[in-house]
Amino acid sequence: MSEEKQKFHSIIKKYVNDVPYVSSGEKGVPELEIRFGTYGNKRTTRIDYDNVCKNLLSHGFKPTSKLGKSILRVTNSYIDRNTGQTRMSSNIRTEITGIDLIKQYCKTNILPESKDYFIQQKKHASKDDNTSLFPENIDAYNLRIAYSRENTIYKDSKMGLSIIDSWNDTKKAFRYINRTTFVHPDFPFNIDCSIVKSSKKTKNNFTFAYTVQEANLFNNPETYEIEIEVDNSKTEGYTTEKLENAIMKCVKYILAGLQQTNYPVSYTELKDVGSSYLALIKNTSDYLKPNTFIGPNSFTLQKQNIVVTTKTTNIPNINDDYSVTDKADGLRKLLYIHKDGSIYLINTNMNIEFTGCKSENNKYFNTIIDGEHISHDKTGKFINLYACFDVYFINNKDVRANEFIKKTQDPEDKKIYRLQLLNNTINELMLVGITGKTPPLKIMAKRFYASNDSSSIFMACSQILDLAYNDGFEYETDGLIFTPCKYGVGLTKQNTQLRSSKTSWEYSFKWKPSKYNTIDFYITTKKQENGEEVIKTVFETGTNTTSSDNILQYKVIILRVGFDEKKDGYINPCLDVINDNIPKISNIDDVDSYKPTPFYPTNPYDPNAN
């Protein structure tokens, strides 16, 4: 048993030994919590939060409330007599529950009636030798396990009266929580998924304020917390092993949501896979980031890339030795076969997903393939298909410089082409599943059609479009992808250097029917003069203060598109002349002129569209 697992086991064992005998009293109510993403590898995002909730629902968990539970937690500060500094009473907090009571407090910053709030003190549980049992971080799963004791502080006690009497004169830290609790009849605990707004932090310490308004609480960014809390009333009959197994089962459900796979693995393993990937592509980055995705982006096909021309030009043209395949309605991901044969998918944000598959052919270990991950077919049935369209590395060897497709039957042609290598790899992969011989992921190579002396690229396109129209694909397609036959990955006539980072390939094109065309907007939030975001409410003419509905707030965003004055002209040249905003010839080429600019459609023109 590893050191981390031993620590995890010992805390659960201590809790199981204590809970039947001590439910309350001076030592307090036992509380065993497991929190995710609060320390270490990766913070929890809104997408993570949503994915975990979906995964819990799919495993039979039910929310106790559809709207969630609203909680305002207030922690008072005190002056450290030794240093004179303001410090937070980390183990004592006041809690107000319910949106109506929270609204009331936010208006007045005065505690409600005595029965409508409570004060809690939380302390670390004690080991058998009466020393504190501190929380333990389990880095392998990016979680923290803590066993503590909670006591309610009576409001007429000395400590309670002190907190209440000094309330208005004491600075505080605030946390507003909207918590959705999931429960399952087979598990003795609650899984809490929380959206949190907190007082601002400076160097990981809360900034204290007297009021909610001074703390600017509701304008601060949201954070997301996921935790398992054992229900003491449901643990009867649970041994340490039984409770640990139940917890680990739910840890798996949560990690499956966070990693977007039915086969979650430890973050230690994911880190090792990421390091191996970077070493293979010879990228010197310390960690994975979006620009380490080596699959090149394609350009949108333009008229200049289609029109037949007799002029000598450097503009790539699909009439000149190109191949075409379908563009699937799936997610672009790299398929990476690790040094032990385990197969992972890596998306464009460099998030790694274990597929639950392995290759038993060591000839293809340390291989990188590019393709599209298609989860459902046209009818909505789950197919879990990976459709490959290129290969970059095979068994540690970089094959990106190879030409793509063989167009002739010339026996003298001894070149090795990437499409040939890709097909051989897929056919010889010897794919198996880790839980059985049937692999959960289906892997196929896409079919490419190339232009030749008897068939133009447009005839090749027609073949694919006819197949799509006649249901020749089990999955949805939304266009075509054009790949040059004679060039290595990312290479052009002028650029012959392979790159180990993200790039756009000006010889690779994508085309979509008009009904599938989209515009990618870059958004920024509208700011006030002081730089803070503009936040408005849905109802500005007044609100019903007797209602328990949450006040709906929104931010104003500005839609922006990429604009380059060197290529696209000037946004408003007449106004530039009036304002004497004339670019200097000496520095016009030294400035990065590609920038996000507010979107102004020209047909029809609408100055307020952004």
Q: Where in this protein do the model-derived segments appear?
A:
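Phosphate-end processing signature that detects enzymes handling 5′-triphosphorylated RNA
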Residues: 1-283
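Eukaryotic intrinsically disordered and solvent-exposed regulatory patches
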Residues: 16-20, 166-168, 178, 195-201, ...
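Intrinsically disordered, low-complexity regulatory tails
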Residues: 131-132, 167-184, 200-281, 376-410, ...
